[in-house]
């Protein structure tokens, strides 16, 4: 019997199962207690129970398997992992573990892991010899994530324009700079849809920090990938814990040579949360930012890299500007030079309902010659020279008309020849 299968069932289905297994007072129990009772019942019959989760190692040496469905929140149905298992299999925070579990004995509160079957989808022996993420060699991105698709929908235009103006590669550290109400969340959704459609082998994680609950639900329903969230009514410590879990999980996957993409909305709110959490150093920068507060969000953002030994970690993070808060401007200024790709959104275009509201002259990718073939690069440069003297609004409208008139970017380049 699988713990995660029970978690996905509705309460009414669990109650029916409990009644058929003759558990007393089933309809008065909470969902967690129902799962507990059912699993205990199975264990009494001598059946094995299996569980899975993402490991969080606590300072005391032991750890727990947290569930991605609850965004790694500590709960009563977490699975305890003993220090000896962690040492034996060389486990770290962020490892995804599957294995056999047992019900709590007297005086225990949690399920316990008995046998480790898989670590990050592979046999546990394999993870002993992997190179740690910190020791891998970072390189410039050399392989592009194509965001253009074979559909004639509105959202394909977003992907095609990003492919032209600031292409995203495997291992890109991209900053999406956006004033409020400029369509950044929708743009992230479009990027997520394009990546899941064109690159199914990539592991996609959408991390929503300090977002509105209805946007979280919309993301979960529209994106085929893992959506991890911490809404704006949660404390700052929770934002920080979620972000740490996600980045550790991503690092473990990169060590197994996987391509991981994290879409973060937004790094500004994450930096604010860290600013609340860090102990006061006594030095305060403009806008009330503590001098040490930005080191950890920079470590999060700086983890994005293309790895020579195989695998890559791509992070597309949104940074808020023009919110009227000095702190947000300071945070943006600190992150400005750290990314190797920038996408600037424009408030004026969004107010005129031109989407994607991309500012062409200010957006771009460093070393894009490594991502884009040489013949296309010449054309893109010609296009930029043509669009430079125009007003930002006119340039975007002109580019959109030309893109809507052609079926694909290749056709668009061919039409430029004429």
UniProtKB/Swiss-Prot annotation:
**Listed GO MF terms:** ATP binding; ATP hydrolysis activity; ATP-dependent activity, acting on RNA; helicase activity; RNA binding
InterPro entries, A to Z: AAA+_ATPase, ATPase_F1/V1/A1_a/bsu_nucl-bd, CSD, NA-bd_OB-fold, P-loop_NTPase, Rho-like_N, Rho_factor_ATP-bd, Rho_N_sf
Q: Which EC class does it fall in? A: hydrolase
What are the record keywords, sorted? ATP-binding, Helicase, Hydrolase, Nucleotide-binding, RNA-binding, Transcription, Transcription regulation, Transcription termination
| Pfam families membership | ATP-synt_ab, Rho_N, Rho_RNA_bind
Matching Gene3D superfamilies, A to Z?
1.10.720.10, Nucleic acid-binding proteins (2.40.50.140), P-loop containing nucleotide triphosphate hydrolases (3.40.50.300)
Q: What is its EC number?
A: 3.6.4.-
From what superkingdom does this record's organism come?
Answer: Bacteria
Q: Name one GO biological process term.
A: DNA-templated transcription termination
Listed binding positions for ATP are 169-174, 181-186, 212
* Disulfide bond residue pairs: none
Q: Output a single Gene Ontology CC term carried by this record.
A: cytosol
The answer to whether the entry has keyword Nucleotide-binding is yes
What are the residue boundaries of the Rho RNA-BD domain, all occurrences included? 48-123
Tell me the function of this protein: Facilitates transcription termination by a mechanism that involves Rho binding to the nascent RNA, activation of Rho's RNA-dependent ATPase activity, and release of the mRNA from the DNA template.
Family statement drawn from the similarity comment of this UniProt entry: Belongs to the Rho family.
Q: Kindly state the subunit structure of this protein.
A: Homohexamer. The homohexamer assembles into an open ring structure.
User: What protein name applies here?
Assistant: Transcription termination factor Rho
